[in-house]
UniProtKB/Swiss-Prot annotation:
Transit peptide: 1-40
InterPro entries, A to Z: ATPase_expression_mit (IPR024319)
Described function: Required for translation of the mitochondrial OLI1 transcript coding for the mitochondrial ATP synthase subunit 9.
Underlying gene: AEP2
Keyword annotations from UniProtKB, A to Z: Mitochondrion, RNA-binding, Transit peptide, Translation regulation
Organism: Saccharomyces cerevisiae (strain ATCC 204508 / S288c)
One cellular component term from this protein's GO annotations in UniProt: mitochondrion
Top-level taxon in the UniProt lineage: Eukaryota
Gene Ontology BP term (one): mitochondrial translational initiation
Chief location bin: mitochondrion
Name of this protein: ATPase expression protein 2, mitochondrial
Miscellaneous notes: Present with 2680 molecules/cell in log phase SD medium.
Amino acid sequence: MWINRLVKHPSYSVLRFYTKRLCTVSVKSLREFGVLPNSTICHSVYPRRTYVMGRAVINDILIKKSYSTHTVCAIDRSKDENNGSAYDKFEAKGIPIDVHTLKRIISSSGMDESEFSKSISYLFAKTVDPEPKDVLSLEDLSFLLSKLYTQRFQIRRICRDINAKYSEFWFKLFSLYAEKVDAKRNQVNLRNTKLDACEIFDANLMIKNFIELGQLGKAQKILSFILDRNPDILLSPKNADISTIVHFLQLRCGALAPYWKIPDNSEQKQGFLRKMVRLGAKNTSIRLSSTYKAMDHQTLLKIADLALQEKKLLNSEDLLSTLIQSFGHLGQTQILERCIEHIWQISPQEFPSHVVIKHRGCYPSSKILVSILVSFYFNDHDLHRGLSILDSFIKHYPDVKLDALFWRRLFQLSHFAWTPANDKKATSVVRCWHLMKQWYASKRLRPSVDYETLRQLYDIMKKTGNFPLGIDVLRSFKPGIERTRAENAGKVNNIIIKYQKCIIKELVNRGRFSAVREFIDSYGFDRKMTKDLNIFCANRMFLRSKKMKNKIENKKEREKVRLDSFDDDEDDGMIIGSLW
């Protein structure tokens, strides 16, 4: 009750009077409610977001924000409402950082450490606590870090505008954070003390950001920062941290599938080596580093041994997905098959459909199935084994949800596996398309629009001349396309125009003018697009008629030349005959 009264009367005198008591009682109360454990070192017993939320609650009450009541009430929410990260919940009522302040802080990243630290303190004072502070505490910087991460896309745009290095700004922020972490331990003589759960959470947040930027070297340095201070964080059943293990597998065991070089059979030319492509090369949501090497294979086997024994690790979708990719990148497909059989009871040997199987880990998801498909294709250069295991998953786990990323990867891999010399009509890719339609129809769902999926199917349609496939694609995605166009998705709009023009061109070339009119009426989507398509159609019809006219005239010309040549030969024959 006294905490609520304090929030209602936020005078500075009352705040200073109760600061010490508030910290002590708040921590004690949070422990009683189960929000904070008795020890912050054994962080694996409770979820990391619990510690982050506890720190955020105390920090928010101390800085006297109006939205602190929402944070306190969040403790009593049900588990279903607390599925997101603690920082995301805390940001729900937060104040976004204005553009002017962001520009100032980004510009300061080129200064020395002291000036950058002062700029960060200014940012905290302007956005969180107006009371000036000479030195920003680690808790304050942790809170500020979460705010900056939620606005990372805006920060990236500002960096482009002022010609600042976005990645350098974040690494400077990490350097300041690491300095405060070590300084905190020096002050209380805890140099050998491990990082607590909130510090590990913050470090992993920055690793995730650098992986998205394709700055794997900087991500490696932050990972080393965690491992040097918490050497048992990967292999200890008690202290294992899932996010750190996932990032270790991604950075040091090859579990970043978008970076893998995949052979593309569809572009292979006779006498030339197969072209190697990367799955994430066309994805604008991430940047790819120019090099990617996996290093630590021994630790991978130890992590796998731990993961297959610990229930909390088996229930992590992210961990199992990255573990599968690591085995795929290492080429250990036999170990991968045994892991799949151990966790989900799925084997390359077909089970009878009436057999009831039980999974030991998390329920199979789209992310896990993508990892399985990519891993087997990476080693086999063929989809046969991956698709056979996929069929078993769909049969024995009917509730598995296949999202847009799954279908994107399936079409990418089927396109790469397609050999035009052996399959001119790309029946393997078309079969995957029908599989996708059947799955969505069985679930009574509409397929979600994905640019890369549309692009892969467009390439197949154009290479094979299979315009009925293009019409079928537009028909299936029509509701999603209309919704996406309303949101001004430029890339999707451009690929749709390519579909339309390619189909109109094929129909006009085949003389199916009534079908062209029906197509434009059905898939014009709006008045402007319909007008543009009619103009394009009229131009194609004019070019076709001109081409046909030239063809007829050329045929007449050739016939005339042939007749003239025949007459000359006949005259020559008559002359020679008379001489004889």
